[in-house]
Amino acid sequence: MHLIINTRPESTSAALQQALQQLHLPCVQLPGMAIAGPQQVQQVRSQLLAAVQQDVWIFTSINAIEQTFSLLAEASAATSKWPTMAVLGQGSRHCLQRFLRQHGMTGVDIIAPPAGSSSSSEGLLQHSRLQQVSDQRILILNAPGGRDKLLTTLQQRGFVAEELAVYRRVPARLEPAAVQTIADWGGDLLTLWTSSTSIRFLQQQLHASNEADAEAGKLWPRIMHGRHLALSARQQRLLKQLDAVTIIIANSPDTNNLAQQLQELAGA
């Protein structure tokens, strides 16, 4: 049996942790990154409110959805017409629908990757609404330092597209209890990665701990030696560069599917 290391940010990992516990799987949270709001909150809020006149908003993650609605606050009730809102997967769709209900926002069109395509930027770009050459205005809501494939592809297709960073990814604090749990585990490790940023941040955090904390300093080689479940080929390539060997790409980013696949891999 493997110990599952969940590197998702704490703000988005509760459902997965609960699913893993219900399956009676040994698991520990070791977030690679945390989510923070923008540094210039008022400026970003003003830009966001001005952008309600645009045709489409694209949320690149659940974090983008949560931070956007946090920035909108009471302003959502004062606006009668909203752009079409696009998401990359079913988890994000459910999250967006929940926030729309909470804010009393009705009649908002939601688009997502069509059936049979991946829950990703590439999948969303296959949607017919984003295939047509158009001068529609599109706002991509994300964090600094992400991929620019969406932006460049939409601009190449003739859309008037721009980005707005509504949140930041910052390194998470290493929790001593989590470090100790992994250090004390005598068996193999199975790590879930949900972003390339988490991989880089956690590597930096654990390498920086070499001198200050001997236990934490030993973790990175052990983690790399174990098994890995990644969400994308991009994460797989990065893990290979960091000397990971056994890397499986998840069938789906959906929480229940991840829990089921982790259960299968943990018992293998």
List each language-model region with its residue ranges.
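Conserved beta-alpha
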Residues: M1-A268
